[in-house]
Amino acid sequence: MDTLDKLTILADAAKFDAACTSSGVDRDPQAGKVGMASAAGCCHSFTPDGRCITLLKVLLSNACCYDCAYCVNRSSAQTKRATFTPQELAELTVDFYKKNYIEGLFLSSGVIGSPDHTTELMIECLSYLRNELLFNGYVHAKVIPGTDPDLIDAIGRLADRLSVNLELPSSTSLTKLCPHKNAETVTKPMSFIHRLRVSEERQLLEAKNASKGIVKSAGKPKGIVIPTQKQIIKEGLALRSNCLKNTFMRSSRVSSNKRSFSPAGQSTQIIIGASPESDNQILHLSQALYQQFELKRVFFSAYIPVIEDHRLPELDTPVPLRREHRLYQADWLMRYYAFSPDELVSPEAPWLDLEIDPKLGWALAHLNQFPVEIMDAPLEILLRVPGIGPTGARRIIAARRRSRLTFDDLKRLGIQLKRSHHFLTCCGVRDASAPLDQELIKQRVIADAKASSYNKTRRRIESSQLRLF
């Protein structure tokens, strides 16, 4: 079997893995080396200048000794198997880079014999790629649960980001669908990666302080960053586009390009719809993972029924793509807007509303906190208004220093008034066309969304495009 035949099989086998966007690494080009990592990201991500860049998403092998019920590569599956040699895959990656097909590599694998043996092969591939072929581009590597810590350390020195897939939202479902795995084997490498990153950060900070003659630095604990009013005004005047650094995101005291071990951190993936857990359980799990292991991302992957198994949903079960989308929106609110899971879901209402986004759902459930006066609302309150994002909120704060704002002014600032005008007053004046009833607001927002040019275009494309699976 030649290399391209293997690629056809192993790229297709990797398509169900969602946790492969890049990441926060901004490594400059180096003399004599091939490629560079961009903080803007790859794997069909868009850079600030509009470029779309991709990575090669592939398995080292789809042979696997595990028999996870949901996996197309499980040991009992009747599928064509293939395995790259480490050198073969490394050379293919550089060849694709030189042809401008990709700017990075996402590397995973089925379990060949044991987690340690598989990881050793992945390390051999990445070592050849980095040290012999001098590839300097972005690399995301999967850590297989049960891998020896020394091997995790080694692969973390070669990859920009590591990920350990949690796969299922509860230990009960993991035991039922993945007989070779348990929650401890998944969380143990997560904890090890976290400890190594914290240790390296501490060493880098101590070295930095020592170079400045500082004996000891108290430092500020990590957490939600609440900018000062002066910072907000300055940013509001300067902002021209949406920028993640201006949200309530967690701060890092060490730049990624200073780190040697997994500089872009770690992520995980949770499969949605293969097991009965609610959105309430999933979002609380996500919050715990962010807090305990400082994950950069929790990815959600809507389960696609392609395997007939009594433990899984029927083959004709719809793929829960909208639920996946709502979970991503809720996750975004938790990571960047300082929402907690308890504000979005609860044991009494454990499912996100599929018709409206979670931020609007929260606002409709808390109408007693609205309308918000645009001239004096603080940043954290403005960010809770549907239709106002971090850039818009800072523009409002900067603009209201100069003049009294009207709804026309908000429109010029780029605020989505179709959503936000229901929840705002400008100098004490409410938009007369905005209803005060919860259900009327919901139906109007849904109607506006259906009539949007984006959704019209999407429906037209979906009706004319052949689905791959």
Can you describe what each PLM-predicted range is?
Residues 311-383, 419-469:
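Long, highly charged, low-complexity intrinsically disordered interaction regions
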Residues 90, 113-337, 343:
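Conserved AdoMet/S-adenosylmethionine-binding subsite of the radical SAM
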Residues 399-400:
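Residue-level signature of tetratricopeptide-repeat
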Residues 1-63, 416, 424, 432-460, ...:
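Flexible, acidic/Gly-rich N-terminal and inter-domain linker regions that tether
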